[in-house]
């Protein structure tokens, strides 16, 4: 018995495939008589576009400007990130690639304020945020962490509590330090519906009990709102 949602693995390993969707039986099919497109349609319940045609990007103005940026290492005396310079512009996705353990994590920590840099500058929308507080950065910057359990969620909090982790202090959600429960619930309900975050008890679901994919969707919803 092989359980997976990865189409390539299913097609390579299985002779027959039974699809469940939302806990209900959808159908059984021989893999030799089907393809990834048909399987994905059965799994999701609608036609799925497996290949995306991308038109050429036309980047705009600089949004994130990083110059001669360095972040110290916790393991040794050398910098984990040393003298890095790059610019990310509006309308583009900039990828920084590398094998795990080669400074990518420390770079993110430095940019988001989780670690103090040892040199260089960071500008966001023209404003120097090199030494800005995390809350100040959060007004213009979103962070979807590589480790959702370590930096993305408080696992023993409810879904609605996690949705306002970075905004609970706003007058929309509190009054003189007292949380406005109805406002938090309404806000969380909206994000859950908009981003199709599935959980057993909706906004009062404990984050730890959710599937990894829905935990990730909750983080994306919070950060992109």
What are these regions, as identified by a protein language model?
Residues 1-225:
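Glycine-rich phosphate-binding loops of nucleotide-dependent enzymes
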């Amino acid at each position: 018995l092989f359980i997976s949602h990865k189409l390539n693995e299913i097609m390579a390993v299985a002779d027959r495939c039974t699809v469940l969707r939302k806990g209900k039986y959808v159908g059984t099919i021989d893999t030799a008589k089907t393809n990834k497109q048909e399987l994905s349609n059965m799994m999701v319940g609608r036609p799925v576009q497996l290949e995306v045609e991308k038109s050429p990007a036309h980047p705009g103005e600089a949004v994130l400007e990083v110059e001669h940026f360095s972040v110290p290492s916790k393991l040794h005396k050398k910098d984990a990130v040393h003298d890095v310079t790059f610019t990310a512009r509006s309308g583009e996705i900039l990828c920084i690639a590398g094998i795990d353990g080669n400074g990518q994590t420390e770079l993110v920590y430095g940019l988001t304020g989780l670690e103090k840099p040892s040199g260089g500058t960071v500008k966001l929308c023209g404003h120097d945020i090199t030494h800005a507080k995390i809350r100040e950065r959060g007004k213009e910057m979103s962070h979807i962490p590589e480790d959702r359990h370590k930096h993305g969620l408080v696992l023993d909090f409810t879904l609605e509590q996690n949705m306002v982790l970075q905004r609970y202090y706003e007058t929309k959600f509190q009054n003189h330090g007292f949380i406005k429960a109805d406002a938090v619930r309404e806000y969380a309900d909206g994000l859950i519906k908009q981003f199709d975050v599935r959980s057993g008890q909706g906004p009062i679901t404990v984050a730890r009990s959710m599937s990894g994919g829905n935990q990730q969707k909750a983080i994306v919803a919070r950060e992109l709102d």
